[in-house]
């Protein structure tokens, strides 16, 4: 007999909702445990089977910790601003807010149908003005502290769409939607000074319990390198430019210099003879992204400006070139080229027949550049020194002569924070006609996104908000001065930078969150989500958290103590699930056919949580069969509790396996090894089926262990066992170390290395007694007839080997 999952799951979901079973109190003196999911973007497609994998993992932890006596914070919300809703609005003419609300309602329904123990009273939505009031407030604080500023930045401008595109929306120089040409165009943009926190973002990674691979990705993204800044004067001009290099020791090997095409000097120093070639080159590279420009595999391109730099030590004239492999956004937008000792410079010099000068011995520069350490040559006062000595000496010389200085550089750029979009948080700034700008006063927050039935690009590169005259145009009541509101909106990252803080105090209209509550709940103990957010979301959230720490708002330096990335669930054909491939599995269908408990159990049993594994209908059927076996063990055909579950069985055969199961399952849940925990639950059920009678205490313990994974059947079996309250707060089972060990052990008896018999003997039987038992065994006596025993080797607890001939 199998159980009716539809009936049982509906019954318990209704019970939890009605009784607010999972409401988290703030005034509790139990120890706290904050377990967080990366909240989803509520897309039109709804939940797919990949979402519940991470959500089930956090739910198992939340449910176990409640039973272990913790006050658990386990919330859910919606990261609901973002491009797809805006694109939908552009395509259909519908309001993105309505579309988003409909999607949220569908996501919430789906998530509730999976039986997760969220405290729905704490639900948040990044598009709710009561929420983004505080996103705007954080922006104003950043602005006050000089960490939000405006700058000219080259952006991806698509003339056909009349809008600026994010890097992710540009593929090979064309827009992802419609395939229109995209060019790089400088525009005034809001920037956040994340670089001010670069060192702390790097150093504090050491204190976190995160996967090493994610820490390494963040380290590389921040990209700290030590070196020197060197000043070069331009021959015949009253201009200088600065280069950053990690190898100032090779300065004597510099034979030319290169400026990024966007460098402000390009216009000033290009000679009339070279101007046509330079203009043609600038036009040609307009459509290339930074990624394409710095691709090591591609052929180097460039053009000579006609101007020369003066070598800061020797006074030699070095030609100044322009090349797209130098980015304005990295270092200073200018490099000194040392082709004998740098791969990119070498390729470039070879292509354009520029001179090379060897200054570090040890390689053969006819064949390839030498980038290793070695003795310096052709380098005046650096000759004979190794790399580090030469670096130190050159920096000292540059500083003494006012030609340069020691410098730390980062690959990390300031965060381009504005988007030319409608569907995002308005940036609370007013630009006045006299060229000044002021923040919207705090008491006027939230600055609400105006409703409009016409979301279309402005065509000027501004966001669609620029079209809403009555919202954009303002007059200062004190002075009568006219102004325009900022029409750019914040990126989707903004709302997700601090949402974990708002869950702690979601209805507070006086402050971001009550400091006492923040002190109680932070940091997040476990954060689970996909590895695709390894860098940006986690880096941005850490940046905002550190900023709020500096303001004295949060009590911890870091937001997320332990991070775990679940793997991806692939289609049955081992490909990524996608609509276009037709291999998407909808959880609604599985809940209907197999039940939410089966889906949860299957996703946790598929393999290690971090692995990417293909969906298998056979595996899903197997999970359901296991739950049916569990049900039949507890419940008779007529729905009563199995009479063989008794308080005191005549023969307690399950004691050892029960204690082993409690130990293994508890340890495995704690360390997120859910697949091996479930294997152990299966072992217990197999043993229980062999027992004539089962001790009720063990069967109750088993149900408690199963309930975090399969909460509906857990509650139902708990009720069948005679309880009237929810299982959610019952104490977690404990095990007795002394009961884990077997008192009888199986011994193998060999003759001349071949197994001839097996004995069951007490675990602590000494060596001599073991030999006697082996030689007295009937099977062994038979085998030894007519032979002489030469030697007996006994290993207690393992084997006896008899040598005879």
UniProtKB/Swiss-Prot annotation:
It holds the Pfam family tRNA-synt_1. PROSITE patterns: AA_TRNA_LIGASE_I. One of its GO terms (biological process) is leucyl-tRNA aminoacylation. This is Leucine--tRNA ligase. Belongs to the class-I aminoacyl-tRNA synthetase family. It catalyses: tRNA(Leu) + L-leucine + ATP = L-leucyl-tRNA(Leu) + AMP + diphosphate. CDD domains: Anticodon_Ia_Leu_BEm, LeuRS_core. Keywords: Aminoacyl-tRNA synthetase, ATP-binding, Cytoplasm, Ligase, Nucleotide-binding, Protein biosynthesis. PANTHER family: LEUCINE--TRNA LIGASE, MITOCHONDRIAL, LEUCYL-TRNA SYNTHETASE. GO terms for molecular function: aminoacyl-tRNA deacylase activity; ATP binding; leucine-tRNA ligase activity. HAMAP family: Leu_tRNA_synth_B. A motif ('KMSKS' region) lies at residues 576-580. Its EC number is 6.1.1.4. A motif ('HIGH' region) lies at residues 40-51. Disulfide bonds: none annotated. One of its GO terms (cellular component) is cytosol. It is found in: Cytoplasm. The keyword RNA-binding does not apply. The keyword Transit peptide does not apply. It comes from Geobacillus kaustophilus (strain HTA426). ATP binds at residue 579.
